[in-house]
Amino acid sequence: MKDAQLNTFCQRHQAVLINSASNSITVAVVDAPSHALLDALHFATQKQIDIVCWTRQQMENHRHKPDQAPSANAAKGGETAAQLLNQTLRSAMAKRASDIHLEPGASRYRIRLRIDGVLHILQDIAKETGLALTARLKVLGNLDIAEHRLPQDGQFTVDLMGDSISFRIATLPCKEGEKVVLRLLHQVEQTLDLDTLGMYGAQLTAFRQALQQPQGLVLVTGPTGSGKTVTLYSALQTRNTPGINLCSVEDPIEIPLDGINQTQIHPRAGLTFQNVLRALLRQDPDIIMVGEIRDGDTAEIAIKAAQTGHLVLSTLHTNSTSETLIRLQQMGVARWMISSALTLVVAQRLVRKLCPHCKQRLSDPVVLSPNLWPSALPRWQASGCQHCYHGFYGRTALFEVLTVTPTLRQLIASGASAQALEAHLQQTGTGTLFENGCRAVEQGMTSFEEILRVLGMPHER
């Protein structure tokens, strides 16, 4: 179809053809294109179709111009959106970002990158460019471009820097427009090895011993984004041999692994954690991994599996090892079941590592109460350099490991308070998260300010 015909065709659908190149066309619409327009355009031309969202005032201004022929200058918004998207994705990859946030404001859009768990501003862009970028992302993610009132989720893959990179897109209607978050699904090959997790001697020994048991429940706890998944998969890999039947139920399957029978739940189809767990017990499993214990039913099935000759690994959203014991009781699991099945609890957090190229030790130390840490801690500063951009490069995990001893089993079964459980942990555990964080500060791995950001200041004992 010729450009003149395309222009007339677009006008019938209250749209404007603003650019036509050899392999693409750019069409401007008010707010968002209709399904009828998109379907008709795909039928009329084989070229790539780029949509630019204009305000009603922009459309009126365009219609009153004496020359309305498609031009390269008029298509600047569409070209800018395409170029900006490519630049943003490249910046995210170069800076090791895990997420990209596109946030609408009253007059401008803000783009932020989450790097090592912290958001950093990349740039602000014009409102029109932000709208065009949002529309382009929704088309890439196969979302309903005309829907602005409801959240949407999708996924797309692009060729970037010589690799095929996948992104998960999620939109959310906000006061000033649609907020878009992209999650980079591209992951660098990661060695799933217990020795590389960051546990020190006593913690690693306790973890290995629990994983070699023929049965029992091992829980890894912490908030979202604390590294639980890598710890869990590393644990599975230590037992991944031809003589063992490893099964998992996950939402979603985050790291595909050879040798493990991985099942992803599908609640809409009736495939829930509970249903899959019951089915797995009829699959002659040796070790079962449950991606997350979300409710009492799942917890009870997992514990029963751990009591009947299976080693069960799972995660729970709690802040510490002692809190995990209380949370299971709050879920409705009987105390005797917890005390008989639970063998080990690991709590963890991720902290940013100081950049080795620009970190400096300052003269004034950090002095804490002796009840919290007995000696002065070095104070570190990293101002940022060409290697790290912000003073930190990468993250490492802090761990708190609690082995369930016979004494602790009695405390759980008798309904001991959180304070009593915490006191027992202080006497027999391998150190709290805060104590192990202070150890990392002593070693120059991270700063005390970073420990406070992630853990906060604990109460004195």
Report each predicted region and the residues it spans:
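Charged, low-hydrophobicity low-complexity segments
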Residues: F43, D50-R90, K95
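Short, basic, glycine/proline-bearing loop/turn elements
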Residues: N23-I25, A69-A75, L192-D193, N261-T263
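Short alpha-helical interface patches
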Residues: Q11-V16, A21, T45-Q46, I51-Q68, ...
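Polyanionic, low-complexity intrinsically disordered segments
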Residues: M1-F43, Q152-M161, I165-A170
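Short, flexible helix-loop junctions that flank or precede catalytic/ligand sites
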Residues: C10, G78-S91, K95-R461
